[in-house]
Amino acid sequence: MSLTDTIRNTFVPIHREGYPFIAGFFVVSLILGWLWDPLFWIGMVLTVWCIYFYRDPERVTPMDDDLVISPADGKVSFVGLAVPPAELDLGYEPMTRVSVFMNVFSVHINRSPVRGKIDKVVHRPGKFLNAELDKASTENERNSVLIESPHGKVGVVQIAGLVARRIVCWSNQDDELSVGERFGLIRFGSRVDVYLPSDATVRVAVGQTAIAGETVLADYGTERGEPVVRIA
């Protein structure tokens, strides 16, 4: 094994979105340390925390169009029927929704739950209520992504929360996403909702831990052989 491979396997990758913040914390630490030595170490603790916050570990994603994979790390906080946000244009009838709540210690990178083409991306300003509240789905600031998957339209909604006030989505309309592909992040935790077609069968329960890019949230009940996976 080469030195490069050893380093890559030892240290968790950091997402590029975190580079400016990590550099900023480090520079501030140097300035504070010049004023008073103990402040340098306080600043370095915050710098390390920032590195941890923007970690972006590889995930082993099953490449199966009949599976819906978790878009976020965290706890499954809701499984049931709910009316999707109007901007998704999915109608006014309730759809199956699975919500994953991310806390401040979760990996904050969001991944596509399915393979498909993005029909639209819509950002809506709103409140910053506790993301664990059900009304946060309609009242909080959010970013809604509609994906045309092999089994129909799937809605993915990034929701800001009490602490999280910055939603990032670098994917755009007409982009093609692979299942498990990174499409955005929510700083300081919050929640991601997934709205599924009626023929999807949910495979998780409230309170269960979900891992972005790996945990199967739902499937379409078809028989399948040995799964093909992608590490990314």
Swiss-Prot record:
Q: Which GO terms describe its molecular function?
A: phosphatidylserine decarboxylase activity
Q: Copy the pathway line from the protein's UniProt record.
A: Phospholipid metabolism; phosphatidylethanolamine biosynthesis; phosphatidylethanolamine from CDP-diacylglycerol: step 2/2
Query: Chief subcellular site?
Result: membrane
Per its UniProt record, what InterPro entries does this chain match?
A: PS_Dcarbxylase, PSD-A
Membrane topology annotation: Peripheral membrane protein
* Disulfide bond positions: none
Q: What is the enzyme's class at the highest EC level?
A: lyase
Q: How is it modified after translation?
A: Is synthesized initially as an inactive proenzyme. Formation of the active enzyme involves a self-maturation process in which the active site pyruvoyl group is generated from an internal serine residue via an autocatalytic post-translational modification. Two non-identical subunits are generated from the proenzyme in this reaction, and the pyruvate is formed at the N-terminus of the alpha chain, which is derived from the carboxyl end of the proenzyme.
Enumerate the residues marked as the site Cleavage (non-hydrolytic).
G189, S190
Assigned keywords, A-Z: Cell membrane, Decarboxylase, Lipid biosynthesis, Lipid metabolism, Lyase, Membrane, Phospholipid biosynthesis, Phospholipid metabolism, Pyruvate, Zymogen
PANTHER family found in the cross-reference section: ARCHAETIDYLSERINE DECARBOXYLASE PROENZYME-RELATED
Q: Which family does it belong to?
A: Belongs to the phosphatidylserine decarboxylase family. PSD-A subfamily.
| Gene Ontology CC terms, in alphabetical order | plasma membrane
Which cofactor names does the annotation list?
Answer: pyruvate
What EC number(s) does its UniProt record assign? 4.1.1.65
Q: Which Pfam families match?
A: PS_Dcarbxylase
Query: What does the record say about how the cofactor binds?
Result: Binds 1 pyruvoyl group covalently per subunit.
Subunit text = Heterodimer of a large membrane-associated beta subunit and a small pyruvoyl-containing alpha subunit.
Catalyses: a 1,2-diacyl-sn-glycero-3-phospho-L-serine + H(+) = a 1,2-diacyl-sn-glycero-3-phosphoethanolamine + CO2
Instruction: State its location(s).
Output: Cell membrane
Protein name (record): Phosphatidylserine decarboxylase proenzyme
The Gene Ontology biological process annotation of the record reads: phosphatidylethanolamine biosynthetic process
Q: Which organism is it from?
A: Brucella canis (strain ATCC 23365 / NCTC 10854 / RM-666)
Q: What does this protein do?
A: Catalyzes the formation of phosphatidylethanolamine (PtdEtn) from phosphatidylserine (PtdSer).
Instruction: Name positions with the PTM Pyruvic acid (Ser).
Output: S190
> Superkingdom of this entry's organism?
Bacteria
Q: Where is the active site?
A: S190 (schiff-base intermediate with substrate)
